[in-house]
Swiss-Prot record:
UniProt KW Lyase keyword: yes
Classification via Pfam families: XFP, XFP_C, XFP_N
Keywords assigned: Lyase, Thiamine pyrophosphate
PANTHER family (alphabetical): PHOSPHOKETOLASE-RELATED
Lineage of source species: Bacteria, Bacillati, Bacillota, Bacilli, Lactobacillales
Entry-linked SUPFAM superfamilies: Thiamin diphosphate-binding fold (THDP-binding) (SSF52518)
Group of enzyme by EC: lyase
Protein name (database record): Probable phosphoketolase
Organism listed in the record: Latilactobacillus sakei subsp. sakei (strain 23K)
Enzyme Commission number, as recorded: 4.1.2.-
Cofactor(s) demanded: thiamine diphosphate
Cited InterPro entries: Phosphoketolase, THDP-binding, Transketo_C/PFOR_II, Xul5P/Fru6P_PKetolase, Xul5P/Fru6P_PKetolase_C, Xul5P/Fru6P_PKetolase_CS, Xul5P/Fru6P_PKetolase_N, Xul5P/Fru6P_PKetolase_ThDP_BS
GO molecular function: aldehyde-lyase activity
Family annotation (CDD domains): TPP_PK
GO terms for biological process, alphabetical: carbohydrate metabolic process
Amino acid sequence: MTDYSSKEYLAKVDAFWRAANYISVGQLYLKDNPLLQRPLEAKDVKVKPIGHWGTISGQNFLYAHLNRAINKYDLNMFYVEGPGHGGQVMVSNSYLDGSYTEIYPEISQDVDGMKKLFKQFSFPGGVASHAAPETPGSIHEGGELGYSLSHGVGAILDNPDVIAAVVVGDGEAETGPLAASWLSSTFINPKNDGAVLPILNLNGFKISNPTILSRKSDEELTKYFEGNGWAPIFVEGDDPEKMHPATAAAMDEAIEKIQAIQKAARENGDTSRPVWPMIVFRAPKGWTGPKTWDGVPIENSFRAHQIPVPIDSTDMQHADALVDWMKSYRPEELFTAEGQLKPEIAAMAPKGDKRMAANPITNGGIDPKPLRLPDYRDYAVDNTEHGKVVAQDMIVLGEYVRDIIKDNDQNKNFRIFGPDETMSNRLNHIFDVTNRQWMEPIKEPNDQFMATEGRVLDSQLSEHQAEGWLEGYVLTGRHGFFASYESFLRVVDSMLTQHFKWLRKADEQAWRNKYPSLNVIATSTVFQQDHNGYTHQDPGVLTHLAEKKPEFIREYLPADANTLLATMNTVFQSQEKINLVIASKHPRQQWFSIDEATVLVKNGLKIIDWASTDQDAEPDVVIAAAGTEPTLESLAAISILHKQYPDMKIRFINVVDLLKLRSPKVDPRGLTDEEFDMYFTKDKPVVFAFHGFEGLVRDIFFDRHNHNLHVHGYRENGDITTPFDMRVLNQMDRYNLSKEVAIDVLGDQAGQFAQSMDDMVAKHNQYIRDEGTDLPEVEEWQWTPLR
């Protein structure tokens, strides 16, 4: 029986660590002569070594010990690399365990393959200095710091047999998102979920500053982490001979505590919130590298952060220092002359899927299943009479989502995430069948819908956490959505960017399996935030995402409940997209039949016959609308215009899939010029009522024939005011739209009508200041058929 704590076994762990360190340094500097089997020459060294050293050795040490723990306890474990610029760690270790070569056969486990491995790192046409999608075993690149623990938690939800070993950088730990993510202990259910083992890598320094937590005493850190629901286990030192047994003991203690917690929950029915173990690992930044340079410390200093020895192919003055450093790992003990890891060391790596780099969870998930969807048509609102029914789109969606939860109860592969906004965003019906997952004490009747098990995670007021959990969940093959206030999606728009970048690069890797899409619902929108005011009014996430590569971005603006149902049916079946859905939560008139809604979503837009008077002829004007309030105001404007100018030929177009309007030169899905002209004509005025910033629509029309465009969107005007006044403030109301159309079509002949519209706006302004509510003409307006 193997003694995993014996000196002999730990000596092999040390050898594996040294091999990983050697491979990691080689990737920084060399492009040839990988085993230094001849004197180092300028041609062997990169012109410009790029990369980072400071975090590498400590992480390689942890990786080797996690391998030991996997072997000892037969664990299902994967690795999340939180510290920035640690790209060599997962590359080096996957190369040593063989998984890298299985994916990239040209990077063979011999001298020639090692040469290619070294050269490609941070090299044109090569691989990144992060744990990018090209890296086996990675679900987290770690370019933008702060999300490692959120991703790890998202991954282990509903994966009860999995442990996420999340190494948290001590610089990363200073970010807001990471600091918030320690509260994740409140949400991990040990019965149904896996476990996260956070390992705080306290190497002491960032780019040029000390790290805050590294200067705290063990007592202070213990209080901090215990208050967040974690029991820290400390390991500290710089002597490998002492650090190996200490780290092995710490790992054993942590794993056995996790297993005891899970056993108590699964076999004994313990529903209390556990105190999960974590490891605080204090080892020097740049450990095992050069101690000093030019009389100042390198190891255990910020100076170890990047390239510690100044050597490149044009300056070989200090080549001996690099050679001495690399040979300090005694490569002749680690590799054969042919460049293969010696068998007794290679045997230390876990086998098959037990290798962290080959764990299926990191490549699209463990046995991923498609979402079972009920027929969205069964939840449709009867809109036989357009605008007669008043409903709340998100309430209706909640009925559909409620049944998605029921239909997927057995698979446990669907969750809803949010920052304390699920009820505010009117997803009330989901609580007919589930609860909020919450492991803290529950105090009824003061609390509502709280339980130790539930499909909703919305009880932490952190957009970063909700987004990070969802990312971890979908990157491991499951499904869900994140619903939040539209303006506060800007809090996580950089996270959305990072997820997009992951999707794009992962899609280029033939070996990467597909991911379910990341679905984001923006509600409590800019034109519905009259009660919360200017701070809550920002539709800019539309513009932000539209700037990304179009293959991975979808933006939907359903105008009513039926269109929202058809939209969500589409996005839940999609893969490798970021789907942004702008949805209304307030009572609104309902417009489209479920068949119309289906066509709207399928085609992206539709000429609405019942709201048009062009009778398939060339119109005098095109009125287009994208969004709930833009659609309402456009229809009201059409009513006003038709009453005043019954002979005016108006074409009304509703737009749901906004980016489909773009030219095929920009977006492969875009309408051809012929199709676009069929909708919008080549030269007739287009008055476009838009939910977002106007520049996005102008950009869409730039490559088209028709530049006779007049956009009425959000003009950065807002306040605490009435609902209709929000539209008036931005001239996206029925009166300003009607005035625009009349002037565009009739010119000076529309002067009297334009004045009447200005008079209505003036009347509105006075009325709301007198009465505090909108005009009866607005509040009581109903659609009447045009013919």
